[in-house]
Amino acid sequence: MALYRGNSRKLIASLGAVLVLFVLVHQLSYVDYYTLVGHISASTELIQACPRPNRPKHKTSHDARQAVAGRNIPNIVHQIWKTADVRTYPAWSSRDSWRAGLEPFNYTVWLWTDDDIVGLIRAEYAWLLPTYEGYPQNIQRADVARLVVVHAHGGIYADLDVHPKSVQGVSCLQRLGLEAIFAPTSGALGLSNHFFMAERASPFLLWALHEAKRRGASTSRRIILPYLQVFWSTGPMMVTAASRDYDRARAATQPVLGVLDDEYGGTVVRHAAGRSWHRSDGRLFNYLGDHVHVEQPWVGFPLLVAALGLVCIMVRRRGWRWPASRPGKGVSF
């Protein structure tokens, strides 16, 4: 009988390990291609300074971009919060910093509320409304909302934890003649959406909105980890994947998008990175992203396996068991 119990436990443990491995592989399948390559897409230019030093005297692609009719990024700063009272934001809001720093230079700082966003989508992006309302997490709606407002009006988007450091730097980026410019993620291999700017009716932003709809609410629910679910469906993974597809569709001969070099970007804006919406999985991945270069699979995958192994060891040592559920109640987490 004891032998039977021992074999049963081993079998259950083996089946559990196989199940965990299957779930892990399934979740990793949602990690987009940009995390597996060592360069940005051809349509995206890495911006390391503005204005660029040592410009050649002959006509350049930059000069050609400047000549594109109507290509400019308006002097509008967009920010989003649930209501018009930013005092309810859980960290120091950057709204006053943007107003004090840029309004004297003929900039307008707009604060969009949840009701404003829904009204704009109903009026001009009705095809997106079911997807927008179907997201299980508010941050997914916020991710889509920022793309919508900048596509509709053009200008600059900044999270409420992004503070301006250089008005001249912001203005210079607007004049580079690029369609859109984004803050970096994954060591400038990807595009982040906490700070970006674009021309009005940017074709790329519209492309990204359609990509967000394609990855809509029902599809994103297949992802178990909330952090990965957000990043894949509406966040930096989605935006970066959209930029690569946009690049392939356009077959561009010169960059139309820009991503800030991490060091240079830090001279233009400061990101306090409140990350108030993140759960434990998000905090873990953010720590790894901040301290370890995990963009390559031979680094990232072993780290995930090691983390999984550590959890298994802790569970085994503590002799963890499922808590007995009370009659009429499920297990709470």
Please tell me what each predicted stretch does.
Residues 2-142, 158-333:
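Glycosyltransferase-associated regions of secretory-pathway enzymes
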Residues 143-155:
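Small-residue hinge/turn detector
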